[in-house]
Design a protein with these regions (language model features):
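Signature for HUH/AEP ssDNA processing cores
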Residues: 94-166, 177-185, 303-307
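Acidic/polar low-complexity segments and flexible, solvent-exposed patches
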Residues: 296-399
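A contiguous, low-structure linker/loop signature
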Residues: 61-115, 122
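A short linear hydrophobic-aromatic micro-motif
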Residues: 158-163, 204-206, 348-354
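C-terminal accessory nucleic-acid interaction domains of nucleic acid-metabolism proteins
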Residues: 1-27, 31, 42, 46, ...
Length: 399
């Protein structure tokens, strides 16, 4: 199957392949969806380099991450070389238009993961991103509450805030910014937002860096780091839900499950793109950087943490599993709980720390347990891991 888009030929292979087994949606359904929401979807990635997150065997299997553009690609597919903090470089695909977008979808990309910079200026982000990440047990109403406070903080400091569901458990708040500041400065501004949100809503929001110390909704500012990407507006997530741009008037009553591959087609036809004016509303970071200066260093961690040696957790953590898949890791957790039933009964939802870790080309899952609710004499020690997958080819024991 081939599509002609603005004079470019996009070949679609295996259009009838089922990508979402639960709903039965195929690759062609995914292609058709992105064509309908093209204006909004392209706006979310236009002129940006992207990391290719490829589900070549469907969303029920693990994706692999591909920074480098495929060697075999149409001559019209553009690339740009990015440098990473590790010192490595990669020529990444730049999405310019719908043809580029659909070409990446044909590779097995379900969601789109752009960097916060444009290809013509890779050192100065034009987007500030806040990712609201709830700990287990936190309700959607609390996430919405934190999102509204994040909006207030951004707008009080001269930026227009743009909300969207994440397509998963969380929520995203974006702001277009003038591309005049470095990654470090943008991250510092985002951290200032997080700390101010936490100050206003200490019972609900947290900006604490270490996962085991968090409660409520983590206002994640680190998505503004140079090597981080976030699923873009209108991205279909592996859950089958969509990262849906919203108007702020919709946020209090929204539910993530309302925005699916099917329902978004009707929504887009009826309401268009709530983010249509985003590119014309770029603002300055000066006020947020002044806020960061006034806040001073974080009291809960040193300004310049040591680069050598392992951090000693302040919470009583034990590591349970490192697995290639989440299912394997969760099965290991259940075996551990069966061996320690009295301990398992005392655990709160937020005490089970499930981390999706990014390896060289794929994700893997780490599970740790915080024993803070277990009396000290009854806490089991660190045991051999239930699953001991080593994504890097070296031993890294301990929590």
């Amino acid at each position: 199957m081939t599509l002609e888009l603005d004079g470019r030929i996009v070949k679609i292979t295996n259009p009838d392949r089922v990508v979402f087994p639960r709903s039965g949606h195929t690759k062609l359904d995914l292609i058709s969806y992105y064509r309908v929401v093209a204006e909004g979807a392209v706006r979310g990635v236009a002129d940006r380099p992207v990391i290719l997150k490829r589900f070549v065997h469907g969303v029920d299997r693990e994706a692999f991450f591909q920074k480098r553009a495929p060697a075999k690609r149409p001559e019209w597919v553009e690339v740009v070389e990015l440098s990473y903090p590790s010192g490595r470089t990669a020529e990444e695909v730049v999405i310019r238009d719908l043809a580029h977008l659909l070409w990446t979808v044909n590779l097995g990309c379900v969601d789109l993961n752009p960097h916060p910079v444009r290809a013509h200026d890779l050192d100065h982000p034009d987007e500030l991103r806040i990712d609201l990440d709830p700990v287990p047990g936190v309700g959607w109403e609390q996430i919405v509450r934190v999102a509204l406070v994040a909006r207030d903080v951004l707008e009080e400091h001269g930026l227009t805030a743009w909300p969207k569901t994440s397509g998963s458990r969380g929520f995203h708040v974006y702001a277009r910014i003038e591309p005049r500041w470095t990654f470090r400065e943008v991250r510092r501004a985002a951290e200032a937002v997080a700390r101010e949100v936490e100050r206003r809503e200490p019972d609900v929001a947290t900006s604490r860096w270490w996962k085991e110390e968090r409660q409520g909704v983590f206002v994640d500012y680190n998505q503004n780091a140079r090597d981080h990407t976030v699923a873009s507006a209108y991205s279909v997530r592996p859950t089958g839900l969509v990262s849906a741009p919203l108007a702020w008037s919709e946020v209090p009553g929204c539910r993530p499950e309302d925005f699916t591959l099917a329902s978004m087609l009707d929504r887009y036809a009826e309401t268009g793109d709530p983010w249509a004016g985003m590119d014309e509303r770029a603002g300055s970071l000066e006020a947020l950087l002044e806020l960061a200066e006034a806040q001073g260093p974080r009291p809960d961690r040193p300004a310049a943490p040591p680069r050598q040696g392992r951090r000693q957790p302040v919470m009583p953590l034990v590591e349970i599993a490192r697995a290639a898949t989440r299912d394997e890791a969760m099965a290991g957790l259940e075996r551990w709980k069966a061996r320690h039933p009295e301990v398992a009964r005392l655990l709160q939802p937020a005490d089970v720390l499930v981390d999706s870790m990014r390896g060289r080309s794929s994700t893997w899952t780490r599970i740790r347990v915080n024993l803070r609710h277990v009396p000290e004499p009854d806490r089991p020690g660190q045991e051999p891991l239930e699953v001991d997958y080593d994504p890097y080819g070296r031993d890294q024991p301990g929590p």
